């Protein structure tokens, strides 16, 4: 190839010059290559030393990193163990908290049920309280009415006692009047036989008419035992005041006796109504016994105080409580003897 590229020389000197120039050229390039090689070798040695230093540093760093990695691995293992322990503890704690939560929910539901039951019981108690208060107010109202009625009946009984005393007195006066009329009839018969045309004939006729109008029965045994000591002067004089009664006074006295007897009959009807009221009170008492222990206790206390007050009042009024209760409790279909009305 070189031979092909070799130029053709015309002379040997020209060829020698050519080859000299070429050898100088190659020698110079060889010298340059050697210098470059030497520089390259020096650079490579420096680079090798630098790389070896870097390699040592890298190996030292690798060893440090490996030790650090080993330490971190051990720490990771420790942390894993701690995490597992913490997870186990957390799981146990969560399980316990869930159990406590379930128990708390159950207790909460029970408390809600208990609260509802208490509210229902409270509503029932409030309704019972309102019913008890209503029944108690009704009972107090009826009891106050009964107290007022009993007070009215006490006054009526006091009036009846006074009227009975007045009636008994008037009966005694009427009996005395009948006896006086009988005596006057006998005296009038004697005077009529002695003096037929006496001016006192009209008065005797009036006395006989009054005696015929009197139809009172005899005084009952019980009442005569109450007044066993009647003076003889009262029997002879009528009223016991020392002066004989005129016919008009006798007729007015008989009218008063008739009015009093009618009042006594009205009082007997009121007494029968009082007995019926006592029966109604007994029935109401039996009814109120089923309204509960509270009403029963209050009613017992109130009725006890009423009973004490009632009989204290009767004692203060001069009445016998036993006789009064017996008179109210014992039913009498007919009037007692000696209380028949007068026919005037």
UniProtKB/Swiss-Prot annotation:
Major localization listed first in the record, in broad terms: cytoplasm
GO BP term (any one): centrosome localization
Ranges in a coiled coil: 26-189
Keyword Magnesium: no
One Pfam family this sequence matches: NUDE_C
GO molecular function terms noted in the UniProt entry: microtubule binding
Post-translational modification: Phosphorylated in mitosis.
Subcellular location: Cytoplasm, Cytoskeleton; Cytoplasm, Cytoskeleton, Microtubule organizing center, Centrosome; Cytoplasm, Cytoskeleton, Spindle
GO cellular component terms listed in the entry, alphabetical order: centrosome; cytoplasm; kinesin complex; kinetochore; microtubule; spindle
Sorted UniProt keywords: Coiled coil, Cytoplasm, Cytoskeleton, Microtubule, Phosphoprotein, Transport
Record's keyword annotation contains Cytoplasm: yes
Task of the protein: Required for organization of the cellular microtubule array and microtubule anchoring at the centrosome. Positively regulates the activity of the minus-end directed microtubule motor protein dynein. May enhance dynein-mediated microtubule sliding by targeting dynein to the microtubule plus end.
Protein family membership: Belongs to the nudE family.
Entry protein name: Nuclear distribution protein nudE-like 1-B
Gene designation: ndel1b
